[in-house]
Regions:
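Glycan-recognition and catalytic cores of secretory/periplasmic carbohydrate-active enzymes
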Residues: 1-653
């Protein structure tokens, strides 16, 4: 499983083993199948290719299977370990015998590439041999410890799913190397904060997998050493001591990984100060810096909003000021919202509040799924909320998805998360089953009282709000509590079955219903959520969206592409608050989804100079034209064109 908190003393709920939960239909089944059949093989080809990524070739050079120099990115090792996770999950979920064998071959290669002292970073190993001046731990931007962290996590996943120790043994040797490194850092006071601290989560998972308390101590030590960094910066969240953190800032991936790691530590050790930090920074994100799509990190490159003239204040791929949420230039790195998922998931296990899964689901169904093309072969590194026909400036990344870019961290991170997505469906505590992300599924549940049954969820969510729960293969003679999440966006609905029949109220939104099922053998509980189309407006401090609204239905954010309207330009479309939306089944590239058909106002801008900075206002009236909205996750899978989520509202008196 992704995180094994079954023995974590401060976990209120625990994840089900991912191999015991399977999507059986609907959107998540389709996305998992696409990941297994298309994305994982595509990424394998990229990593195997000497000419594209050079990643596997670097391991071969370290192992003595090939000759040559290091090539590719410094974080390629870690990205490959992330792909290994996706491969392990999909191979064993689908019983892919060939992929299982290839995984073991890769593990053998990784083991032979490792140095006798446990060190394993291909750039440095090759550099030591060629004498090109590259040194171990000489530059935090070489991502060595980031690579270690993803190795730790992949090795734990491999052990839990296969029962084999070969990958875990390699990871343990590297953890031993890291232990000596931190002991030396404490002795000398020479401390650097590792960028993108995946190793916090990785080390805690090593402890959970092996029971060796050295790894938990090492995670605590690694986090505490942040406070000893000299010349820290907001970009790396180490300018001030961790326990003084109140705002989310700096590089968004690094921030979300940091707080996910701290949450992992808090699941194992009580620390009220760290919990206070987690609460403050979470509120900073959710209340003032999170995009409607669940995207994290508004800025490309710039200066920290909280920096001073003489401070280290450069930031990149970062959170900005409160309410600084541009649309065309929204950065929203895919790895950042994935990190937000990891963080929210751990926070939920600390305190099972519906908000954490509301945010997790928003990130997963909108930004994260949008980062992958419907055919599973092309990726967004950054996730804009608006695309214009053309820009007068050049952004770092392409405005459409790419099969491969040099900075390839997001695709394997996305692949492993989709491969593991069924783990976000259910959690358990005592004699309770808690729902996380909804989707048609079957879960083999074993409760702490020894009771076992298969929980069957039947639904077309997120396109339909009716969710039915039944049970089969029941081996329990005691009541079961079904804890059902009512998302914060659901203003109504109903619950039926188990003697709990009633209409839902506004007070139920954003809470868990506790449904006592006295006879699990005859379980039949139906939750119906309000799926009315919603107009959503932002705080007026979000300057780019003043006077505008977005359209949501259920957990999905909707957008419009230029191909789906007869307007000359998407900027000409204004929302009519009296317009009716008709949900209709729609397909793009053979993938089924629910679109919204409507008529909206379009303004006549025939005399408008779209190249002028300023010009006299000319109004020639409005007309009504057909508009189709599609789920944001499905955009950029047809012809290139405009896209936008936020539209000006045509208020009437």
């Amino acid at each position: 499983m992704l995180t094994d908190t079954t023995r974590s003393p401060y976990a209120k709920v625990h994840a089900l083993d991912g191999m015991k939960v399977k999507w059986t239909g609907g959107l998540w089944k389709e996305r998992f199948d696409t990941c297994a059949n298309s994305t994982v093989p595509q990424l394998k080809h990229m990593f195997d290719s000497k000419d594209i990524s050079h990643v596997v070739e670097n391991f071969k050079i370290c192992a003595g299977d090939a000759e040559g120099d290091f090539d590719g990115t410094v974080f390629g090792d870690g990205d490959f370990y992330k792909w290994m996770e996706s491969a392990i999950y999909t191979a064993y979920q689908t019983d892919n015998q060939l992929l299982k064998k290839e995984i073991e071959n890769y593990i053998d290669l990784i083991g032979r590439a490792q140095q006798p002292d446990g060190y394993l970073s291909t750039k440095q190993i090759i550099g030591e041999r060629t004498g090109n001046g590259v040194s171990r731990m000489g530059d935090i931007n070489d991502f060595e410890v980031y690579n270690f962290g993803h190795m730790f996590t992949a090795a734990c996943v491999h052990k839990r799913i296969t029962g084999k120790n070969n990958f875990l043994t390699i990871a343990a040797k590297t953890a031993d190397y890291l232990e000596h490194l931190y002991e030396e850092a404490e002795r000398t006071g020479e401390v650097q904060t590792a960028v993108c601290p995946s190793h916090y989560m990785g080390l805690v998972e090593m402890y959970r997998t092996t029971g060796d308390k050295r790894y938990l101590k090492l995670a605590r030590q690694a986090i505490a050493l942040r406070d000893s960094v000299k010349n820290g910066m907001d970009d790396n969240q180490d300018k001030i001591p961790l326990k003084q953190h109140e705002k989310i800032l700096g590089h968004a991936v690094r921030a979300n990984y940091l707080y996910a790691g701290v949450a992992d530590l808090c699941l194992e050790e009580e620390d009220p100060d760290y919990m206070e930090v987690l609460h403050k920074v979470w509120r900073s994100l959710v209340d003032k810096k999170l995009y409607i799509t669940g995207g994290c990190g508004a800025l490309y490159n710039g200066a920290s909003p909280y920096g001073y003239f003489f401070d280290h204040q450069l930031v990149h791929q970062a959170y900005g000021y409160e309410y600084q949420l541009p649309n065309i230039t929204a950065y929203n790195e895919t790895c950042a919202s994935l990190g937000g998922v990891f963080w929210a998931y751990r926070m939920f296990q600390l305190e099972p509040k519906a908000e954490y899964f509301d945010i997790l689901e928003r990130m997963m169904l909108n930004t994260n799924l949008a980062a992958l093309s419907l055919d599973g072969k092309r990726f967004f590194y950054e996730n804009m909320l608006r695309r214009a026909k053309e820009l007068d400036y050049k952004l770092i990344w392409p405005l459409t998805r790419s099969e491969y870019i040099l900075s390839y961290c997001c695709p394997p991170n996305l692949a492993r998360t989709i491969a593991q997505s069924s783990e976000y469906a259910y959690l358990t505590s005592d004699n309770s089953v808690w729902t996380g992300m909804y989707g048609a599924s079957e879960a083999q549940v074993k409760l702490e009282n020894g009771g076992e049954f298969t929980l069957v969820q039947s639904t077309d969510y997120p396109f339909d709000g009716t969710i039915r729960f039944t049970a089969k293969d029941v081996k329990i003679n005691a009541p079961v509590h079904l804890r059902l999440r009512v998302p914060g966006w659901s203003a109504g609905g109903s619950i039926k079955g188990a003697g709990a029949d009633r209409e839902l109220t506004k007070e139920d939104a954003g809470t868990y219903l506790d449904i006592l099922v006295e006879d699990p053998q005859n379980m039949d509980v139906q939750l119906s959520l309000d799926m009315k189309v919603r107009y959503t407006v932002a705080n007026n401090m979000v300057e780019e969206t003043v006077g505008q609204a977005a359209i949501e239905r259920g957990p999905l954010v909707y957008c419009c592409e230029s191909v789906d309207t007869h307007a000359a330009d998407l900027d000409d479309v204004y929302l009519d608050l009296n317009a009716e939306f008709t949900p209709v089944e729609f397909e793009i590239q053979g993938r089924r989804m629910m679109a919204l058909e409507t008529e909206e106002y379009t303004i006549d801008r025939s005399e408008f100079d779209r190249n002028a900075l300023y010009q006299p206002l000319k109004y020639h009236g409005m007309s009504r034209k057909h508009v189709r909205l599609i789920p944001y996750y499905a955009w950029d899978n047809r012809d290139y064109g405009e896209m936008r989520i936020w539209f000006p509202v045509a208020y009437t008196v």
